[in-house]
Every structure is written in structure tokens, then in C-alpha cells.
Amino acid sequence: MGQAPALSLEWTTQTRPPIEAVAVDPDPLPYPEEYRDRITIDVIHDGDVIPEEYLVDGRGRPISRDAIDRAYIHERDWGASFVAGRIARRLGLECFHNVTTARCLLDFGRFPGVTRPGAPHLRRSAINLPFADRLRFAQARRLLEEHYDVISKAMDEAIRGKLLKIAVHTYDRYNPSGTERPQVSVISRALGYQMDGELPYGVFDPLYPDILAEFTVDRMLPSRLSLQLERQGMPVAQNYPYLLPEGSPEVRHQVWSFFDWLEARFQTAHPDTETSPAYQFVWRMLKDTNMRLGDAGMLRAYIHRFRRPPSYYAQAFSNAEDAYRHIERYLRRNHDAVISEYRFSAERPMSFGIEVRKDLIHELDHLGRPVRLVPERAARIADGIADAVITYLTEDRVPHDFHDPVMARTSRWYGPGGEPNK
């Protein structure tokens, strides 16, 4: 491949759409035709755009260029777009989606908002230092509306109808504690489920079954990724050194997909509800996984926190609460069947993140900053990831009912149900 050109560590103020479909020259389709157009790949942390309007604080004073530079270099997933493009090409895809907005300005991998002081890394919000404490309200609001919401809409369109979403990231060699990170890590479990056996209360609607957060992708695919890459001499970890924060697109995608599926199932059983404004209001609230709809937030607070609605909305909220209780009763009556049907369905939408260490695919300077991409190594890792997906689609996607009954998925580990703290 030859030596790659030196990287620029500079960001740009030249605006582009916050998310772009990056075209690639695809290889011939390497898996069954039924999976054509069922895979999407995205990169959300390799952007380089910081619009000029956000370089000054709420009083019009310039934000420190040094602080922005440090955050930009540290936060960016250097090389992720190269890896994603190579995977997309190998999988016969025509494009992947890349967020152009710099992560240090806006992190689409978190819930919208401004990070509170002292928040741990996995509990951050979308707007972080050095911008979190410098932007005025109007700036932060515009940033979310013109970037976060635009990215979200494009992602929704890209993901809808897909079977598999792959999020490509790169990370530093060392944890903040100084321990070395794995060369490659596959992330497919929600943080809250790992820590407490359930998602944090109030993040998503309680109707979402916590057990679905145990894994965001068929277990065989991470295992296939590990086997494929380990055979090629690349050590792989799973769900380490961290897990998926609840605000990650992968977890939000899982919750949205379940409620979208449940809506169709419920409406099949109760077709008279399909055009009801009250039921439409409830489904909109349940699928507001980005926490961006004001009316959904009001209904959520009305149902779960007994907040008083504005008087002119009182009847609409009361009707919506009745609809919510109907959906709740339906889910409880059919709990085991619904969860089992969805959880192990061959058509359950899947998503996972994959992390590749930055030092494996870059030459670094004495400060640990990327100087030049090492394309041969980056391509080898990307091809290994793609080959694992191909093998999974062509060989591993078999029905689950071939197991010995003794091995049936009925324990707390496998469900259905089994939420320990409910």
C-alpha cells in the first residue's frame, strides 16, 4: 500500500453537513443475497469540524485554542474512518456514515445536554469541556438542534430496516489508571445491566425489559470476531475495558427497535388503536430514546413522576395515560412470550461497537499523538473484522432449537425474563 501521508492534527472551521455518507468502491457481495442492504457502518468520533460560532463563549470571549487543541487530539478516534471504509468495502457496502462534527464539541455517543462537573467518562453528556462551561444557553441549544438532531435523523434513516449496525471506534493504548487496553475490543452490553442487572431508572421507559440489555448482538458474532482475529494474532477482549453507556447509539437503537417492534405487534392485536392520537402519543414517548421531544418528556413526567400537565393538555395526557396502561397490561399478560419472541428472533436488529487501539494503526510521536496511519496493519485488522461478519452471515446464523433440552435457554442467564431486581 505504500507509506501513508502524514496526518494533520488541525481541526477546521469549514462547515460541512454534520453527518456524511462516505462512498466506497465495494467488493462483490461476499454473503447471501438476503443480507444485501441489511448492514450499516458508522463512525461518530472521527470528525474534524468545529464551526467558528462555537469558538467564543457566552460573553463573546475566545475559548482557549490550546484547550480546544488538547481536547480535539485526545477525543478524536483517529483512523476509525479508514477502518470503517475498509470494512464497508469488504462487505460489499457502497458507503459508511461518518459524523463530521468534532467529538470535543459534540459527542453523539451520549445523551443530549451539558456534562455536569466531575461526571465520569461513561456518564458524560453530549457537550463536554472545554465547551460545556463556556457556551451560553442559546449556543448549546443551537448546537444540539443543528448537529445532534441532524445526525440523529440521518442515523435513523440509515439504520431503519437494517439487521446489523457496526460502530467503529479507536481508543488509546492505556486507561487513565495506566493499565494497558486490549488491542481490539468488541462492546455489546449496556453498562447499567452489567453493574446492576438493570438499566438505570428513568433513562428509558420501565416497559423496556432490562434483560434485553444483556447483549445488543447475537452472541455468536462477538465470538466469531474473537476467533477470527485471534487466529490472525490479534488479541481481542469483549466488553472490556468498558461497556456501552446508555446514551450510546447502540443502546438507544436497541430500545427504539424493541418499542417499534412492540408497536407493530400490539397494533396487530388491537388494530383500532393504530390511528388513535392517544396511542400515537405514547408510542412517540416510548421511542424518544434521544430524549429530544418536549411533549414526550412531559408525558413521561406525567406518567412516572405524577407531574401536573398544563390545563389545556389535561385531557390529552389523561387519554395517553389510559393508552399507556393498556400497552402495559398487554406486555405483562404476554411477558414471557413477547420477550422470548423478540430476544431470540433471527430478525432482531443487532448493533455493536468495535474498538481498535490507535497505536496499532498509527505511528505516534513522543507525545503519543498520531503522526501517520499504518495502512497495511489497519487494513489487516479491518479485513479480519469483515471476514468474521461474512462467516457469521454465511455459516453461523442457524436456528437455536438444535440444542439438547438440558441446554435450553431457560435459566436466569438466558431468560426469558429473569430481571433480578424487578
Model-found features: residue ranges?
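N-terminal catalytic or cofactor-binding beta/alpha core of small enzyme domains
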Residues: 2-422
